[in-house]
Every structure is written in C-alpha cells, then in structure tokens.
C-alpha cells in the first residue's frame, strides 16, 4: 500500500503563492521577468515519433540539437544533476540538467524554479541508461513564472465544477480533457471538409436578430443602443440561411453558436454549437442519407473508426440508420400499446396525464392527435433509441417550417435523428409556399398568445423573401456538442464545452 499526502489546504496554497511572488520580485530586480525572445523548433510528440526507435549510438551519430519550451510538470534535484519533465502542446519530454554543463549560476537558478513554470531548454537529444528519450540541457531559461501551484499529481482536479470553472487547470493536468477537445476539433474539421467536398458554401449569418425564429425556444433578450431597438440572441440561423437559398446560393452551411434561455442539464447548455445546412432541390430523404454519411465521416475524423464505445456500450455508426415513424417507435420501444389506442386522442391524453405531463396547460391543452402522439413518444420511447434512428413524419402542428406531405394529411416531411436516446439532428423538406408559411406563423402567434413561450413569432420579412420564390429545399441542423459527447464518450455536455456557464463564485 502506498501512503499519499493529504491535499494541500488553502493556508498551504497561500503560503506557496507568497513564496512564488517573492521569487518573481527577485526576477524583476535582475532583469526581464517575462522574456519573449525564445522560439522552439521542436515539440515533444515529434521528438518521440522521430527518435524513440533509435538507440543512444544512433542518437550520438545524428547529433540532433533542439530547442523546446513548455510547462515544467515534474522536477527531481539530485545534487549536481537533475531531471525535469517538460509538457508542451503535443505531449511530454524529459529534460536532463547538470551543473557542469549549465554552470553554477544557471543551475542554481533552475533549482529555484517551481512546478508549473514555463521554461525553455536547448540541447542535444539522447537516451538515459534506462532508455528514456531526453534533452540534455546546454542552456535553460525561465520564460514565465507560475504564481499559483498546480494540483498535485495524486489529487489532481477532483472537483468536477472546478474543472469546468478553471478549465485552464483541467487542461494542464488532465490528458483526457485535452484529448476530448482535440477530438472535437477533428470532428468539426471533418464535418467542414465533407460539406466543402459536397459543394456547400460556408457562410455567416447574424447572431443578433430583430425577431427570434427558426426554432421553438425561449430567446435571450438584449437592446441595440445605436438603433434603439430590442434584439434577440439567435436561437437558430435557419430563416437567414433560407433567405440565402432564395438569393441563389444553392448549398449553404454554417457552424456557429445558438442561444436558448432555457434549462441546464447533461444534454442542454444555453449556449451551444450547431451546424445547419440547406440544399436546393433536395428533400428529407436525401437529407437523411447525407446526414448519416456526414456523422459517420465525423466519427472517423475524430476517432479513426465509425464503431465506438459510449458509456461501456457499443455504438455502431457504420451500419444503416433505422427509420421509424413516431407510432412505430412507440409500438417497438414502449410495451403495451396498440395502434388503435395510439389513434385515440382521449386515450393518449389520459396516458400522458398518468405519466405526469401537464395536458391541461400549453402546449398540450390545444394539441391535436399528432402532437399528443409525439409527447407520448418523448415520454416512453425516446430514451430507448440507442441505435442511430431517424424518427420521421412529424405532425404539421409541431413543424411550422416543414413542408407538408403530399399524400398524408397533417404530416410533414420531417425527421429527427436520435442516438443513445438523445436528439442529434433535426431536418426536413422546407416549406416554400409563402401563403402556407404565413398561415402557420399566424397559428404560432395564437399559440404564443395562449401561453406557449416557445411558439414562434411572425417574420414578415421572411414571408417577403419566400414570395420571391424559393426552390424546393431540404435543410438540417446537427448539434455539434451532443455529437462530440458521443465521439468522446462524455456523459455531460459540459465535458465537451471548453467554458460552460456556471453560477457566479461567492
């Protein structure tokens, strides 16, 4: 059994900070305390990739001298010689420092450095007697003094909220956190490349909207001082992107932030990243095929495979995604129902009441059969959709921007994609009939007046754009944060957002 020292107390930390501030004061007295004239020419990962396979004889013959810089994470002083571990943006490399090479003054200065300091090393690459690749320091400099001590290696950043609040410390201390955000970057890069390869134009649309639209959500409200008008942080870019389709861009996409003034949960953050794309002359069937491949390619870009492990269960994105209607999903995943029961509004309403839903309040009080079936699906089946599954054929009353089916009354050409019981994407054949769209906006206004805070506003300019004519179009939005959760085996959306929102510190 190994004994571990207790975690440092606040008093200990304050004492260490005071000692480090005193060291910094002495540095200021002797010259430039924070120099900015060192440029590294190598990174730890590159050195390991190039030289781990060579023995000392080959390294001596190669006579490779490098300049590296990074944070000192470990330090072992053994009289006239010392070892340190340097961590840069790519990984870690061992540093060997000795008094005979550095000189008395430089070696004495090194001994005063602290864990967390940013240092610069120049010297040859070699291997120790134990075979560890290292850099033998011919020169060593302190570039940036760390005033706050890092968490010790054993205790690390144990407080989950502290990891979110001080993500910079989490990134320093936790390899898994760095890998998560590297994977996120690769996933977004893979999505962007897939879109560009498919002929889509990347665009940027406003973040401040005079009318919130494009989704059913409660917006953040602000004020534009120069124009003296109320504005809203966007809840979705949809209506602006479709204006671009009207304008003649046939394929557009945007990766950017949305803001919804709603709750926080492991799946929800008020500020989140979406990728929305729109393609002229495409319908929702084409969208499902394209979205399936897009997500598969993002997984491969981020992890190297389309077969993943999420929360100790296999998640296979390599196979065709399932497609079910709302009722088919209920019958498959929620036991005990018949189609006849699902077709009875009174029965569905009674079932929702049993499940604790407020069927007397908005929006269910005014809901038709389709909306009631959707609510029952959300209560009984949604969380069970582990396999990638498209739920299709949503009712018109909950899909105010989607094209109605030509063959089924009250149904739209819309889908939502669920993976591991979470909504990942939402898409549909777009409604391009301006008169139908205006009528649906009016119905949304009535719902808002009846107490539905998430109902949409009437956007007259969007109707005007449609009146110029929009080609048949398909559009889809993908939640980047939720997708990255899957790709990185992260249980909470906060784990994949660098700086999630938290309550103010006391």
From Swiss-Prot:
Its EC number(s): 6.1.1.6
Protein name according to UniProt: Lysine--tRNA ligase
NCBIfam families in the record: lysS_bact, PRK00484.1
Catalyzed chemical reaction(s): tRNA(Lys) + L-lysine + ATP = L-lysyl-tRNA(Lys) + AMP + diphosphate
Example of a GO cellular component annotation carried by this entry: cytosol
Residues binding Mg(2+) 1, per UniProt: 416, 423
Origin superkingdom: Bacteria
Alphabetized Pfam families for the sequence: tRNA-synt_2 (PF00152), tRNA_anti-codon (PF01336)
Molecular-function GO terms, alphabetical: ATP binding; lysine-tRNA ligase activity; magnesium ion binding; tRNA binding
Gene3D superfamilies linked to this entry: Bira Bifunctional Protein, Domain 2, Nucleic acid-binding proteins
Gene this chain is encoded by: lysS
